[in-house]
A protein has these predicted regions:
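Acidic, divalent-metal-binding catalytic cores of TOPRIM
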Residues: 1-247
Length: 247
């Protein structure tokens, strides 16, 4: 019965977007509206796979025989989950700012050199090189990618983003640490490592996954109604998935 309930909407859609969980489900439609490509308005079905159970859905699209696969495009959004030790207490915000940011540098290197979750290669292999399937993965997690996408070389431009404003409201004490880090840099644009450090510190200011997704979603909807000037950048892999389904 579950399979029938899930499959039925797919059959009447123009395309399908598969995401890991309810947090992404809340956000992707709002993200698509920010770039004027509403998934719902374009009849794209958003499917919450309840974790990372993508394989059963890939099988609906991966046959080399066109008569044995669904005809619409399918995009899959997933995290690469490098360096799972980042969840440990030694990498919380207070620890990251100690000893001249020693743990922050370790966290950055751990993520940059960490092994990509094997799920990504498995999904790529299972897609069977079918042009109707696109696997879109982002380094670490969605929450980190959101922060990274909204940090720029110019410090003032970073502070003017909607994301910076939101996290400032949610966690002012944490964002004081972000401000302090940036104020300690020279009066110049930030390099790549420094931008990533700021993104990591912002990421560590966030509340739990579900709370952040719900709060960000409401905040973006309100901001988009108030202002025509979008001050929020989508993570690249999310935008790639949307653009694939809605060229």
């Amino acid at each position: 019965m579950y399979g029938i309930l899930v499959l039925a909407p797919l059959l009447f859609s123009s395309g399908c977007l598969f995401i890991e969980g309810i947090s992404e489900c809340q956000l992707v439609e709002t993200f698509s509206k920010l770039i004027n490509k509403s998934l719902i308005a374009n009849q794209i079905e958003i499917v919450d796979t309840d974790g990372t159970a993508f394989y059963q859905f890939l099988m609906l699209f991966n046959s080399s025989d066109s008569t044995k696969r669904l005809p619409m495009k399918a995009a899959f959004i997933t995290d690469e989950d490098q360096f799972t030790a980042s969840k440990d207490k030694e990498y919380n915000l207070n620890e990251l700012v100690k000893n001249n940011y020693a743990k922050l540098h370790l966290l950055r290197e751990g993520i940059n050199t960490g092994r990509v979750n094997g799920r990504i290669n498995n999904m790529t292999a299972m897609s069977n090189r079918q042009p109707g399937i696109k696997i879109c993965s982002g380094k670490k997690t969605l929450e980190y990618q959101i922060c990274k996408a909204n940090v720029f070389a110019n410090k003032e431009m970073t502070k003017e983003t909607w994301l910076y404003e939101l996290i400032q409201q949610m966690n002012p004490n944490g964002m004081d640490k972000v401000d302090f880090y940036m104020s300690g840099l020279e009066d110049r644009d930030m390099n790549e490592d420094e931008q990533q450090n700021v993104a990591l510190l912002m990421w560590k200011c966030l509340p739990g996954k579900a709370e952040f997704a719900q709060t960000l979603n409401s905040f973006l909807l309100d901001k988009n109604e108030e202002s025509g000037d979008i001050k929020f950048t989508l993570p690249t892999y999310i935008q790639e998935a949307i653009n694939y389904l809605i060229p």
